[in-house]
Amino acid sequence: MAVGKNKRLSKGKKGLKKKVVDPFTRKDWYDIKAPSIFETRNVGKTLVNRSQGLKNANDSLRGRIIEVSLADLNKDEEQSFRKIKLRVDEIQGRNCLTNFHGMDFTSDKLRSLVRKWQTLVEAHVDVKTTDGYLLRLFAIGFTKRRPTQVKKTTYAQTAQVRELRKKMFEIITREATSCDLKELVQKFVPEAIGREIEKASRSIYPLQNVYIRKAKILKAPKFDVSKLLELHGDSTDESGTRVTKDFKEPEVLESV
């Protein structure tokens, strides 16, 4: 009789299944808190693996980028075309405190603005706020008919486009460098900078639909917990101060 394993008997062991462990049992939910400049403070929740050994859950959460519609943040459907990026900077208990990280337009909004018979004017400029944030702001605008114009098209000449772009540079730089990041974000919602550009461009070529379509943070100052807590106020509050859309007509400037 041959000595060895009986292959027929050993075959049954291969069919044994491993015990399935639900990966969600090792994770925790954290609340994401938006700064107090937005009406809705509770943005949502995020998952992270529990702290284990040398791996800390807080380290995994810091630096996460969350993209939220401004319509959800301010409970205003008219602002649904703006996307706000928030960055997790600090963890307090089960709350992730965020700060503004960028702003962009939805692609459908941008496509709806571009039309025939008009000239598109774009500009981008790097600015530094009073609290040390270096941002790149992208502006967009379109030519429109003059009040007494009969002609169908509203094409601007190359020299006029150059002058309009120069005016955009000056106004964006002036408005952004004279305030901190919080005040600059509050200028995006009522489109105060866009209206300033529209007023200043009347003498060159009238513009319409002027927006700061994108804002990108290139460099941030050294992280300060006290400033972040000041921005959030009481992090347990579920509502903040809504940014109003009321626009006050600025004084007419003789020279820019």
Swiss-Prot record:
SMART domains: Ribosomal_S3Ae
Primary site of residence: cytoplasm
Keywords tagged on the record: Acetylation, Cytoplasm, Ribonucleoprotein, Ribosomal protein
Pfam families from the UniProt entry: Ribosomal_S3Ae (PF01015)
S-S pairs: none
GO molecular function ontology, one term from the record: structural constituent of ribosome
Modified residues (N-acetylalanine): A2
Subcellular location: Cytoplasm
Record has Mitochondrion as a keyword: no
GO biological process, one term: translation
InterPro entries xref list: Ribosomal_eS1, Ribosomal_eS1_CS, Ribosomal_eS1_euk
GO cellular component: cytosolic small ribosomal subunit
Coiled-coil region(s): none
Subunit structure, as described in the record: Component of the small ribosomal subunit. Mature ribosomes consist of a small (40S) and a large (60S) subunit. The 40S subunit contains about 33 different proteins and 1 molecule of RNA (18S). The 60S subunit contains about 49 different proteins and 3 molecules of RNA (25S, 5.8S and 5S).
UniProt family annotation: Belongs to the eukaryotic ribosomal protein eS1 family.
Alphabetized HAMAP family for the sequence: Ribosomal_eS1_euk (MF_03122)
Name of the protein in its database record: Small ribosomal subunit protein eS1
Gene transcribed to yield this protein: RPS1
